[in-house]
Design a protein with these regions (language model features):
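Extreme N-terminal, non-catalytic leader segments
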Residues: 2-51, 277, 281-284, 288-289
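Hydrophobic anchor at the start of a short beta-strand
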Residues: 7, 73-74, 204-205
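Residue-level signature of catalytic and energy-coupling elements of molecular machines
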Residues: 41, 52, 78, 86, ...
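Phosphate-binding loop that captures ATP/GTP phosphates
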Residues: 70-128, 134-136, 141-142
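C-terminal boundary of histidine-terminating zinc-finger modules
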Residues: 257-269
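C-terminal-of-GTPase-core extension/linker across diverse P-loop GTPases
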Residues: 267-290, 294-297
Length: 297
């Protein structure tokens, strides 16, 4: 008989400044976040977007799988509490198990994951405000037996807000990848997420452009959402354009069916994600650990 799992949430009121102070690596006096320690090898990658609908979660999922295919130990936290989708995209149907009062995250395609999707019905909304969200994120970090993966990807909700503030405090050495589309309007909105990262001292490492083009059956390439948005954003932020991902039916189908396209390196889209993973792992190596103190202007 499986043990029933609950996600405990403590209610408290705090302003933004207090919330940031509370999250500096030692949330609520419960001990340090595992990935906060200076000698931990794990690279924490926040995957962000300015708006919904740009394919951020599918990029997170497939990047995680691609990093795993390169021989890395990879974990994903689905921090998009209101719009969780990582379990479906990875094809995970079993909930976490419980061993010694710790959650053991389920795994698929070489990627371990934790998500609100394991604790809430997929068709039911999660109606939470800041303090509840903050506590849940704390538990995702401290009450899960992560060990020490090479990469921890955190799928942030679109836009800016409490989730980003909490994660920035828990994990101030995180790196951020910003997902956008070629549309100028999407690029402008994504820019806000990047500027938010600067406010909380998170380093933006690169931009990933999704839905860059569509190749028709006749081999003609069509730029359905315009062109240049990803490059323009990368140039404005002074970071590289890490990769461009085409609009292909298999990407959507794989996300719906739990079969990430990055698992098949023989396909064009699989090879594209593999190259993005290589760039992230090799070309965007962290230079050094930065100071711990947050700068909120």
């Amino acid at each position: 008989m499986s043990k029933k799992m609950t996600l405990a949430v403590e209610f408290s009121l705090m302003n933004q400044e207090s919330q940031i102070e509370e999250t500096k690596g030692t949330p609520h006096g419960e001990g340090p976040v595992p990935f906060f320690e200076a000698n931990v090898k794990t690279r924490v990658l926040l995957v962000a977007s300015g708006k919904g609908g740009v394919g951020k979660s599918s990029v997170t999922t497939n990047l995680a799988v691609a990093l795993s295919k390169r021989g890395n130990d990879v974990a994903v936290i689905d921090a998009d509490v209101w719009g969780f989708s990582i379990p479906r995209m990875l094809g995970i149907t079993e909930p976490p198990s419980v061993v010694d009062d710790m959650l053991v995250p389920p795994s698929a395609h070489g990627v371990r994951s934790i998500s609100m999707g394991f604790f809430a019905d997929e068709d039911q909304p999660v109606i939470w405000r800041g303090p509840m969200l903050h506590k849940a994120l704390n538990q995702f970090l401290t009450d899960v037996a992560w060990d020490e993966p090479d990469f921890l990807l955190i799928d942030l909700p679109p836009g800016t807000g409490d989730t980003a503030i909490s994660i920035a405090g828990f994990l101030p050495d995180s790196e951020m990848l910003v997902v956008t589309t070629p549309q100028v309007a999407a690029q402008a909105v994504a820019q806000r997420a990047a500027f938010m990262a600067g406010k909380v001292d998170i380093e933006v490492r690169g931009v990933i452009e999704n839905m860059s083009w569509f190749t028709a059956d006749d081999g003609q390439r069509y730029e359905l959402f315009g062109a240049g948005g990803g490059k323009a954003l990368a140039d404005k932020l002074g970071v590289p354009l890490v990769g461009q991902i085409p609009l292909v039916p298999t990407l959507r189908e794989g996300s719906d069916n739990g079969n990430p396209v990055a698992a098949d390196l023989s396909t064009e889209i699989g090879a594209i994600f593999s190259e993005i993973a290589r760039v992230v792992e090799e070309d965007l190596k962290p230079s050094k650990r930065r100071h711990r103190e947050l700068k909120i202007n």
